[in-house]
C-alpha cells in the first residue's frame, strides 16, 4: 500500500477520535434534548399504483397528501400513543437506502403491509420513497435522546433488489432479509446482521466493524482499511478480500477444496484454519474462487467441512 494512503488512513482515524471527544464534551454540558412523546409513522400499501412516501421533501412529484387525525381507537394502519397516523396508497419500493450518522437503528421484517418508523429519536430521521427506493436519512445538527433506538419495520413479503446501509458512527442491526444485492459500509460505526440472503454482498469498513452471521451470498467483496469484518455462513462463487490495515474473518460452511486461490500476503497475514499461507496460487479445479490481499492487515478463513 502506498505511503500517502497510509497517512490518509491515519489522519482519518485521528479526526474520528477528535469528533467523538467533542461529542462527549457536548453531552456532558447538557447537549442532549429530552423528548416527551414517542411518535410513529405508518405507511400503508393499498391497491393504487401511485408512489407512497413519508416526510417527502417539498415540491416533489411523488409527494402525497398526508392524512393526519386524532383518534381514540385503532385505525386501519395502526395508531400510536399520540394518535397520529399517516397513510399512503401506492406500490412497494424495490430498493432501500439507509444513511445513519450517530443513532442506533434496528431494521426488522413485519407481518403487516405497513412500513413503520418508531422510537424516541424517530424525528431525527427523514424517511421517504422516491423512484422505487425507500430512503432513511439522519437529519443534520439535531440533538438526540440518550438511549433512544429507532426501529424501522418493513413488510416481510417485500422483494428487494438492493439494500444499502452506511453507518458513519452509528449502530445498525438487521435480521432475516433477502435481496439481489447488499452493500454495507461502516466508517467508525458498526453493522450487525443475521439471516441474510443475497447474490452479491459488498462490505467495507474504515475504522468501524461489520458482523454478519448465518448468511448466504454467491459473491463477497470485503475491504477492511483499519476496521474489522466478520462473516459466517456460505459463499458459493467468489470471494474478493482486501485487508489493508484491518482484519477480515470468514467462517464458511464449505471445504477448502471448494475454491481456487490467489493469495498476496505482502506485509500482512493470511491463514486457513489457523495455518499461515504465503503468497501463492492454488488450483483445485473448483467452481469457487478467492482473491486474498492482506496488504498490512489480517485475513483468517475457517472451513467447517475440513
Spans of features found by a protein language model:
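Short, Lys/Arg-rich N-terminal segment immediately upstream of the first membrane anchor
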Residues: 1-8
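Hydrophobic membrane-insertion alpha-helices, especially the h-region
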Residues: 10-25
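Short linear S-[DN]-x-LW-Φ motif typified by the pepsin-like aspartic protease active-site region
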Residues: 25-137, 145, 149-164, 171-177, ...
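Residue-level signal for short, function-critical loop segments
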Residues: 102, 169, 188, 207, ...
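Short, surface-exposed interaction patches in beta-rich subdomains
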Residues: 139, 193-196, 200-202, 209-306
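Acidic/histidine-rich helix-loop elements
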Residues: 142
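Right-handed parallel beta-helix
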Residues: 164-213
Amino acid at each position: 500500500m502506498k505511503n500517502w494512503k497510509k497517512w490518509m488512513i491515519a489522519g482519518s482515524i485521528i479526526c474520528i477520535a477528535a469528533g467523538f471527544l467533542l461529542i462527549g464534551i457536548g453531552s456532558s454540558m447538557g447537549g442532549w434534548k429530552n423528548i416527551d412523546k414517542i411518535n410513529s409513522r405508518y405507511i400503508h400499501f393499498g391497491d393504487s399504483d401511485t408512489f407512497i412516501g413519508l416526510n417527502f421533501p417539498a415540491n416533489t412529484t411523488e409527494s402525497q397528501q398526508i392524512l393526519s387525525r386524532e383518534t381514540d381507537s385503532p385505525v386501519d394502519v395502526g395508531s400510536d400513543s399520540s394518535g397520529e397516523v399517516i397513510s399512503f396508497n401506492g406500490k412497494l419500493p424495490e430498493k432501500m437506502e439507509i444513511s445513519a450518522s450517530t443513532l442506533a437503528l434496528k431494521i426488522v421484517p413485519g407481518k403487516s403491509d405497513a412500513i413503520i418508523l418508531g422510537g424516541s429519536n424517530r424525528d431525527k430521521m427523514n424517511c421517504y420513497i422516491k423512484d422505487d427506493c425507500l430512503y432513511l436519512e439522519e437529519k443534520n445538527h439535531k440533538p438526540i435522546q440518550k438511549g433512544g433506538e429507532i426501529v424501522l419495520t418493513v413488510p416481510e413479503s417485500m422483494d428487494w433488489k438492493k439494500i444499502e446501509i452506511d453507518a458513519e458512527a452509528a449502530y445498525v442491526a438487521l435480521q432475516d432479509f433477502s435481496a439481489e444485492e447488499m452493500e454495507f459500509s461502516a466508517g467508525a460505526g458498526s453493522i450487525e446482521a443475521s439471516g441474510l440472503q443475497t447474490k452479491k454482498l459488498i462490505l467495507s469498513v474504515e475504522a468501524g466493524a461489520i458482523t454478519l452471521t448465518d448468511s448466504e451470498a454467491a459473491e463477497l467483496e470485503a475491504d477492511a482499511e483499519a476496521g474489522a469484518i466478520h462473516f459466517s455462513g456460505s459463499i458459493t462463487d467468489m470471494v474478493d478480500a482486501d485487508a489493508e490495515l484491518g482484519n477480515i474473518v470468514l467462517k464458511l460452511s464449505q471445504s477448502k477444496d471448494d475454491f481456487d486461490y490467489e493469495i498476496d500476503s505482502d506485509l500482512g497475514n493470511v491463514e486457513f484454519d489457523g495455518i499461515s499461507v504465503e503468497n501463492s496460487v492454488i488450483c483445485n479445479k473448483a467452481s469457487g474462487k478467492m482473491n486474498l490481499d492482506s496488504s498490512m492487515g489480517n485475513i483468517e478463513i475457517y472451513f467447517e467441512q475440513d
